[in-house]
């Protein structure tokens, strides 16, 4: 499985997931008005969102 770890003007960066990590995730955490910290990567289980964030998981490549 290959997951996106970042997006920028230059394109996307990806990572090959380790054995046992069969899901990709994208997590947003609100830092301020219209300002979010976004993290992406591989995971074994979908992480939980905190009160200021949102998480989306999938089990497909990129």
From Swiss-Prot:
According to the UniProt entry, the coiled-coil residues are none
Q: Would you tell me the protein name for this molecule?
A: Synergistic-type venom protein C8S2, chain 1
Tell me, how does this one assemble?
Heterodimer of C8S2 chain 1 and chain 2 (AC P01411); disulfide-linked.
Give the organism the record lists.
Dendroaspis angusticeps (Eastern green mamba)
**Which cysteines link up through disulfide bonds?**
3-24, 17-42, 46-57
Question: Which InterPro entries has this protein been placed in?
Answer: Snake_3FTx, Snake_toxin-like_sf, Snake_toxin_con_site, Toxin_cobra-type
Q: What tissues has this protein been observed in?
A: Expressed by the venom gland.
- Check the record and name the PROSITE patterns matching this protein: SNAKE_TOXIN
What cellular component GO annotations does this protein have? Answer: extracellular region
Q: Could you say which protein family the record assigns here?
A: Belongs to the three-finger toxin family. Short-chain subfamily. Aminergic toxin sub-subfamily.
Q: Name one GO molecular function term.
A: toxin activity
Concerning Pfam families, the annotation shows: Toxin_cobra-type (PF21947)
Alphabetically sorted, this entry's keywords are: Disulfide bond, Secreted, Toxin
Protein's cellular compartments:
Secreted
- The protein's predominant localisation is secreted
What the protein does? This protein shows a synergetic toxic effect in that it enhances the toxicity of other toxins.
């Amino acid at each position: 499985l290959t997951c996106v770890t970042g997006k920028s003007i230059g394109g996307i960066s990806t990572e090959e997931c380790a054995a046992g990590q069969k899901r990709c995730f994208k997590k947003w955490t609100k830092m301020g008005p219209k300002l979010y910290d976004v993290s992406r990567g591989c995971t074994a289980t979908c992480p939980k969102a905190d009160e200021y964030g949102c998480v989306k998981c999938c089990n497909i490549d990129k």
